[in-house]
C-alpha cells in the first residue's frame, strides 16, 4: 500500500514540479550547473534535475540511514549519475552535533523535529496514512551526526552554487544558518516550508524570509503543495540578477 501512496503523491505533485523546473530554467541560462541537495531522500530531486538540466555536479545529503540505503541503491542502478553525483549519509544543520532523528513510516516525512501528536493536522494526516500504512507513525528514533553546510562545502572549493535545495521537514532555517558566508556563492535557494503545527519547528517562515533578505536574497517564486499546508519557495541572490 505504501507504493500506492507514493504513486498518488507523485501524480499530485507532478504539475508543481513542471512549473518549478520551467521557472528555474528561465533563471539559470548557463549549463552545466552545480546543485547542493540537502534532504535527498531516495533521489527524487536528483532524478528531476538530471532529466531537465545539464549537470556538472550534485552533492547530496541524507540524514536517515534507511533513506540513504534507498538513495545509494538508486545511484548504483543509474550509471550515468555515478560520475556527477556524490551522496553523503550525514545530517546538515547549524553546527556540528549529534541529535535525535525521527524515522517515519512514511519515509519522506522523517525529521529532526519533534511531532505535535495533539495537532489537528497530525490527527487528520494519521487517518489518511493509516489507510496505507501499518504500525506507528514514528518507526524509530536514533541519534544522527550533523555538520554545518559551510564546513562540508569547504572540501569541494566551489566558486558558485547554482541551486541549493533544502527539504528537511522543519530544519530548513538550521541548514541555512549553518551555511554562513558561503551563502553569497549561491544563486537560487529552493526550499519548502510547513505552515501546519504538526512539526514542532523553532522558527517561522517570516524568520527564514528575514534571514535570506539580510543576505541580499529576494523571493521570486511561491507555490502551494496540493493537499498540504506547505508551500515551496525559490529565493534568488540579487547579486546574480
Predicted regions and their residues:
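Phosphate/nucleotide-binding beta-alpha loop and adjacent structural elements of enzyme active sites
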Residues: 1-241
Amino acid at each position: 500500500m505504501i507504493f500506492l501512496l507514493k504513486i498518488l503523491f507523485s501524480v499530485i505533485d507532478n504539475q508543481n514540479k513542471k512549473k518549478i523546473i520551467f521557472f528555474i530554467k528561465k533563471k539559470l541560462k548557463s549549463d552545466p550547473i552545480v546543485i547542493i541537495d540537502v534532504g535527498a531522500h531516495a533521489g527524487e530531486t536528483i532524478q528531476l534535475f538530471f532529466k531537465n538540466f545539464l549537470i556538472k555536479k550534485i552533492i547530496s545529503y541524507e540524514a536517515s540511514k534507511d533513506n540513504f540505503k534507498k538513495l545509494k541503491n538508486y545511484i548504483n542502478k543509474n550509471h550515468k549519475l555515478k560520475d556527477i553525483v556524490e551522496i553523503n549519509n550525514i545530517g546538515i544543520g547549524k553546527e556540528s552535533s549529534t541529535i535525535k532523528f525521527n524515522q517515519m513510516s512514511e519515509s519522506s516525512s522523517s525529521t529532526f523535529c519533534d511531532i505535535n501528536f495533539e495537532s489537528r493536522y497530525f490527527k487528520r494526516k494519521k487517518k489518511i496514512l493509516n489507510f496505507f500504512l501499518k504500525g506507528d507513525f514514528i518507526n524509530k528514533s536514533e541519534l544522527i551526526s550533523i555538520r554545518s553546510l559551510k564546513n562540508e562545502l569547504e572540501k569541494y572549493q566551489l566558486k558558485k552554487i547554482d541551486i541549493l535545495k533544502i527539504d528537511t521537514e522543519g530544519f530548513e532555517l538550521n541548514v541555512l544558518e549553518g551555511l554562513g558566508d558561503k551563502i553569497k556563492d549561491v544563486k537560487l535557494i529552493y526550499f519548502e516550508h510547513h505552515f501546519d503545527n504538526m512539526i514542532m519547528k523553532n522558527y517561522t517562515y517570516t524568520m527564514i524570509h528575514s534571514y535570506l533578505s539580510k543576505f541580499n536574497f529576494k523571493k521570486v517564486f511561491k507555490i502551494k503543495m496540493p493537499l498540504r499546508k506547505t508551500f515551496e519557495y525559490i529565493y534568488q541572490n540579487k547579486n546574480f540578477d
